[in-house]
C-alpha cells in the first residue's frame, strides 16, 4: 500500500499551511457535528486529507462517517479505518463512495466465529464501482480473519495491484491462493504473519514491492523464489530485534535471506553479469545479525550487495552491526539508514515513524534521546522541530507499545526541559502535551513512564499558556494521582492540578468537581503528609521533611481550587473529615503562614456554602484558632513582594464573616462579638496593596453576606474584598468573566446595596459602622470614575 512505501525522505508535508489549517478545522467541525451546509463538492485529495485527520484523532464513528460518506459533498477515494472502532453497519456508509484504496483495520464483526469475515466486510464496504476500480487493499491487523478471502479478492477485485495483510495469523495456505490467483500484484506485504514458505509467490512476476518484515521462513529455496521476481524495486527482509543487545529476538531456525542475496551478488560481480534484481532501489536489512559477522566483515558483506545493484538508492541497516558505521560508496548517491549521526538518526525516525516497526522506532528514539541529552545545543531550529514532530508521530502511532512510549516521553522531556520549551510554538507544545497525556492514560501503573510524562508537563512556562487543554491535563493528572502512589509522581500531579484547576472553563470545572473521589483522595494525602511532615520534623530528616511540605502545600492548593464555588466538592471535603485535618494543620503550622493561608482558603470556600450548615466550625476551639489567624504584621513583605500576613488574615476573616452571617451554632455570644470587633479593627489596618492578592469568578461569595448579615465585621470583610479587586481591575482580570470586575459588580446586584451603605443605610444593621460606610463610599467612587471615563455603566444615586 502507499503508506508502506520503502523509499522515504525526511517527512515534511507538501500541504500548504493554509490548506492544512483548513483541513484540520473542517475535521473539527465534522467531529463536533457542527459542519455548516454547503453546495459545492470537496475534491478527492482534500476529502481524503480530512478523512485522514479524523482517523489519526481516532474520531471515525457512525456520526463522522455519515457526515463524510453519506452525501456527495465529499469525494473520498481512499478510506483508512486503522485504529478506529468501526462496526459493520458503519461500513455500509463507506459504500457511498467510489474507492481506489481501502484499509480495514480491526473491526468487531465475528458472526458465529472468532474471525473477521473478510468477504462480508468487503461486500458491505465496497460498492460495485469500488470493486471494479480498487487498486489498494490493506487487511493488516491483529484479529484473526477467514482464510478463503484471496478467492473472493481474485473474483471481485479485478484491478487490485497492492495487497497487505501484515500481523494477521495467516499461514502458507492463504499465500498459496494469492500466488495462484492474484498475478497482477505489484505490492505485497506479508510482515509478521505465520507464513513459513514463500515458494508460491514465484509466480507473482509483476511484484515491485515485497515487504517481509519479521518473517520466519523455514523451508523452500528463498533465493530461487526471489530470483523470479525480476521487477523488484523495494525489498524488506528486516527482523524484529532486542534493542538492548542488537540481537534477533526469534530463536527459531530460519533461512538467512540476506546471505542468499549476498551470494547472488558475489556471483554476479565475479561473472560480470547482473543479479536477478537489477531494478532494486531499496532494501531493508534492519535488525539482521548479518550472519553474525563482526563490523568489518559485515561492512564487506553489505558493500558487495551495494556493488551488485547499481540502481540501489537506499539501504536500511538500523540495529545491525553497522548501525553506527559511516558507509560511503564512491560515485554512488546512496541513502544509508542507521544512527551514525544526528541527521541520520532523524532520517531513520522519519523512515519508520509511520510504519508498524515498534522495535526500530524504539531504537531510533533511544538514539534521539542520547543526542538530545548530550548535544541539544547542536540541533538547529529546523532539526529540533522535525525531531519533535517525528517523536510525536511515533508515540501516536505506537500507543500500544510501551517501549515506544517510554523512549518517546523521555525525548519529549528533553525537548521541553526548562527554557528549551520556548523554542517551540504553542501548537508544538500542545502536541507534546497530547502525546504525553495519551501515554499517561494508556499506562497508569508504569512509574517510569509516568515520571517522564509529568516531568515534561510540570513546566512553569507550559502550564501558563492559555491555549492548552487544561481540563484534560487536570483530569489525567487526577486519575494518575489515584492509581500511582509513587511519591514523585504524586507530588508532580498534585502540583499540576493546583496550577491548572483555576484556568479551566467553569463548565469543565463543574464536570471535574462532580467526581468526589478526587477530593476524598486529596484529603487522605493531606492527612498522610501532615503526619509524614510532623514525623520527619521530629526525627530531623530535613530532605524528607521538605518533600512532605512541598506535597502538602500543593495538595492544599489543589483542594482550595477544587472547592471554589463548588458545593459538591465542599461537601465531599467535609464528609472525608477534611475540617478536622485542616484545623490540625493550622495548629501544627502556626509558624508557617503560607500553609495556613491555603488551609484557610479551603475553609473559606466551605463556609460560603450555606446549605452545609457548618455549625461545627463555630466550636470555641476552632473560633479561637481563626481569631488568632486574623492578627499579623500587615506591612511585612516577603522576598516575592507578597503581603503574606494580609493574605492569611483575609481568608481567616472570610470564614468568620460567613459564620457571623449564620447566627446559629455559636457556643459563646461573647466570642461572636469579639470576632466581629476583631474584623472591623484588623481589616481597617490592611495596607493598600500594590497588586492584587486574590481574584474572583463571581461576587456570589459576597452577595449573600451583604444582603443578609447583621454583622458590621462581616460586611467590612466583603466590602474590602470588592474594593480590592476593583482597585486592581486593570492588571487582575476576572478569570471567568469576560467583561471585567466593574460589570461583575453591577450584574451582581451589589451596587444599590453598597450605594445605600455609602449613605449610612442598611436593611439589616441599625447602626452601620462608620468604617463600613467609608469603605462603601470608596467603592462607589471607583465605579463612578469608571462610568464617567470608559463605560456606559450608570449608578443611580439615592438620597
Swiss-Prot record:
Membership in a protein family: Belongs to the zyg-11 family.
Phenotype upon changing residue 18 to S: Abolishes interaction with elc-1
Annotated function: Acts as a target recruitment subunit in the E3 ubiquitin ligase complex zyg-11-cul-2-elc-1. Required for metaphase to anaphase transition and M phase exit at meiosis II. Regulates polarity establishment.
BP-aspect Gene Ontology terms: anaphase-promoting complex-dependent catabolic process; anterior/posterior axis specification, embryo; embryo development ending in birth or egg hatching; meiotic cell cycle; positive regulation of metaphase/anaphase transition of meiotic cell cycle; positive regulation of proteasomal ubiquitin-dependent protein catabolic process; sister chromosome movement towards spindle pole involved in meiotic sister chromatid segregation
Residue span of region Interaction with elc-1: 1-131
Subunit description: Interacts with elc-1. Part of an E3 ubiquitin ligase complex including zyg-11, cul-2 and elc-1.
Keyword Flavoprotein applies: no
This protein's UniProt keywords: Developmental protein, Meiosis, Ubl conjugation pathway
GO CC list: Cul2-RING ubiquitin ligase complex
GO molecular function (one): cyclin binding
Protein name per Swiss-Prot or TrEMBL: Early embryogenesis protein zyg-11
